[in-house]
């Protein structure tokens, strides 16, 4: 669809690199633009056929959501960059991470996510090595890209690629949450730093997977986001209908009992 390509081009121009520092004034301007664009479009579409209006509105909604997400991701990236450049904080993080019970984490990950022990072990070792080397944010981003590529390689060109990609996100999130849980229980001094890093890496993983799915489906990322939004709205609508039907049936049953 032309609208998707147009808005994707706009995203690529406005935020060409989600990790590169953006001035605060520009970030605020982008957010204000995203906040008002949908309103402006709706006002300009008065009298337009409903179907055309829905198509235009869904595309611009995906565009605005993308701008909001990418500016939030960029904000996290700049906050995390400060942590990753602080050698004393990195040393504390490595010290706290070495106390985590990774054997327990791996056992639970294997049971819940069916993650291979060798893969989980490799991720642990790579993460610790990157901390020890005081890797830059860009180096971390390269590693995350390699993790995604490695995890999805066997599904390349297969019809279940998108499903596998979403499953990978769930597994990644569960595994990282187990590590954060252990750090919390141990009252780790660097918990705040780990929490920030985890937020950034989760969001960046989502960003990477979204683009991998778009590439596999030969679509723009905006189109993938729009598809997801439509699916979400459809599920919510189905739930509402089911809720209404249940209430109607309950009401009818109550009336019958009353008459009886």
Where are these regions (language model features)?
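Acidic-enriched, low-complexity/disordered segments with a strong bias for Aspartate over Glutamate
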Residues: 3, 12, 17, 96, ...
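Short amphipathic alpha-helices and their capping/turn residues within compact interaction modules
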Residues: 15, 19, 42, 72, ...
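Eukaryotic terminal intrinsically disordered regions
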Residues: 168-171, 175-260
